[in-house]
Amino acid sequence: VFKGSTKHPNIPQELSSHGARPNGTTWYDRTNYYETFSASEENLKWALSLESDRMINSFIAKKDLETEFSVVRNEFERGENDPGGVLNERIMSTAYWWHNYGKSTIGSKEDIEKVPIENLQAFYKKYYQPDNAVLTVAGKVDEEKTIALVNEYFGPIPKPSRELQHPYTAEPVQDGERSVELRRVGDV
């Protein structure tokens, strides 16, 4: 979603020209994308236009995978070299046998290197929709104008025809002691 969308084909250039600082993070229950920028009506309109368009019209292209995968691989390797992070991952996988909280949010190295572009595109189309999102606007803004702009940019997006299923897997009762021991070479 950082590469481009139908109305915003060069997102990195636009972010730079607006003096915006973007980022995104993923955790167990959410992914978030954001940008910070100087408070102005022009910047707010631009940001809402950008976010509404990339929510449903992002270029998720095979040609961009290799550069993105190198970024994700680096994040993966940084995590593998963080003893506290590795320990937390092992604790979660011990506590949650079936629930997704027991799985790493970044996935395995094989997931990162071998995921088909079609899977990423299908995930994006299924989950990146207004009915599955929260929009937060903070800063020096006029509340009424901001709500009107949100309606202007996000209102025309049609409600998706798909229905999101709630997870049906139930985590079994933790009926006994569980422990984790992690041993690795290195310094903390």
Whereabouts are the PLM-identified features?
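Short amphipathic alpha-helices in soluble, non-transmembrane regions
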Residues: 47-53, 147-154
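Non-catalytic, conformational "gating/processing" segments within enzyme and secreted inhibitor domains
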Residues: 69, 84, 121-153
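Non-catalytic beta-strand/loop surface segments
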Residues: 7-43, 78-132, 156-188
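M16/insulysin-pitrilysin zinc metalloprotease superfamily fold
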Residues: 3-5, 36-68
